[in-house]
Amino acid sequence: MIPKLKYLLSLAILGIPVALLAAEDPNLPKAEETEYYSPVPPIITANEGQAPSDAVVLFDGTNLNAWEPVKAGSKGWEIVDKALTVIPKSGYMKTKAAFGDMQLHIEFREPKPIGDKKGQSRGNSGIFMMGLYELQVLDSYNNTTYVNGQAGSIYKQHPPLVNACRPPEVWQTYDVIFIAPRFASDGSLISPARETVLHNGVLIQYDVVLKGPTEYRGYPKYKAHAAKLPIQLQDHGDRVAYRNIWVREITLPQSK
């Protein structure tokens, strides 16, 4: 046996961590040289079931002050039992504020199926990051459709890793990390949008690369747009409800 390997095995048998040898190696830098103390991460409060203290609360069940209808002349959606509820044919709703890189928490509830509706006709809605990139909302509980259009899909681009849907009329959650695309001054794409999604606490999308804004027909293609744009919620004709909506703007860390 090689002498050094025999020595290390002897240390392991004696219960002496091999990592301690690093502290005895004069050729390695001091431990302090690989430690830094700034910038200090800000302290936030993150209590169970509540929005973090640095979050922007978009809907808490009491008012629609953070929202407005997209369609001109529309009265928008309504609040029913503290839930923001779609009024069919009223059009999309959008946030008054604009967002780019963000962490989004949103809860939704699918309505009870009516008649023999199936596929895309059951509880259809959507959450559009920047008003352009759709995370599908659909009743996909015992309801089949094309996989890149089921609940949790990045619509027509990425199917979810798993189907984590709950039955209709039961509240569900999406937790989203969205990184906006970057464009050069000439409008060319520097980096595409990326997205990670947890559905009811289960990872269903992991840092997927978006091919461009959502398209129902045709293929997605990037076109330069603002660094921040409003979030939109889709009216697709079904009485989908939303609650507890908050967002945290993200500042990406700079590598050391």
Model feature map: region roles:
Residues 17-18:
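N-terminal signal peptide c-region/cleavage motif recognized by signal peptidases
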Residues 1-12:
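Bacterial N-terminal signal peptides that target proteins for export
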Residues 22-256:
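Carbohydrate-interacting regions of secretory-pathway proteins
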